[in-house]
């Protein structure tokens, strides 16, 4: 459980945590990342279903669980691929599995804050939405800070180079998502075309 315990150390000692993560490369295991992912999905569902309605804007019955899971998994996967690709081009030292692990550790602030924010939302009304949004934004900034630290420390980059890598990674991630959406649209059109051909063939052969 050593690597899993690093997830909690990342809150207080992010630099040391990411150094320890890379130093334990020979003892690498994926299960801490899987556990963190499951925790992330769990707290996200709690947040979505139990957030106070005036702040949530949507009711629980309107939530598409599958879509919400995909909205977490796809960006995490795309970011891991993007940041690894860019750091590799920029002479980074991180392996892909370490990029995945660092990405998951960077989500720890959300794992820690989602449920407290959900509980706190029941003390807030719609007039307190700005304050709630500030707390949520602070959590997102915290995640961004951990991502920056992980890239800088684990690849031995300067701050300037790290910022450049992050910008390029975001652009590459956007490209991946755009290509993915294009492929999905093409696959959908192809499916509809094939289904139409089959329907026409059935009608021509059987009249139904």
Language model: regions and residue ranges:
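Short, Lys/Arg-enriched, disordered terminal segments
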Residues: 1-8, 196, 207-208
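Selected alpha-helical membrane-embedding segments in polytopic membrane proteins
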Residues: 2-97
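Solvent-exposed, non-transmembrane amphipathic alpha-helical segments
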Residues: 27-28, 34, 38-41, 101-106, ...
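Membrane-helix interface segments in multi-pass membrane proteins
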Residues: 44-72, 117-140, 177-208
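Hydrophobic alpha-helical transmembrane segments and adjacent short intramembrane/lumenal linkers
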Residues: 83-84, 88-178
């Amino acid at each position: 459980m050593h690597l899993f315990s690093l997830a909690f150390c990342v809150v207080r000692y992010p630099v040391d945590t990411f150094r320890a993560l890379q130093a334990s490369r020979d003892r690498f295991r994926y299960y801490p990342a899987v556990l963190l992912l499951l925790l992330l999905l769990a707290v996200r569902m709690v947040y979505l279903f139990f957030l106070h309605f005036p702040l949530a804007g949507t009711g629980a019955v309107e939530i598409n669980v599958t879509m919400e899971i995909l909205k977490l998994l796809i960006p995490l996967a795309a970011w891991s691929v993007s940041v690894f690709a860019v750091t590799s081009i920029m002479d980074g030292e991180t392996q892909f599995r370490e990029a995945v692990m660092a990405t998951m550790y960077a989500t720890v602030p959300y794992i820690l804050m989602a449920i407290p924010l959900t509980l706190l939302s029941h003390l807030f009304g719609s007039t307190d939405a700005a304050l709630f949004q500030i707390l949520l934004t602070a959590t997102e900034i915290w995640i961004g800070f951990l991502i920056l630290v992980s890239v800088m420390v684990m690849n031995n980059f300067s701050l300037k180079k790290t910022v450049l890598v992050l910008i390029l990674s975001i652009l590459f991630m956007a490209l991946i998502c755009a290509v993915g959406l294009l492929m999905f649209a093409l696959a959908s059109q192809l499916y509809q075309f094939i289904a139409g051909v089959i329907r026409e063939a059935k009608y021509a052969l059987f009249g139904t």
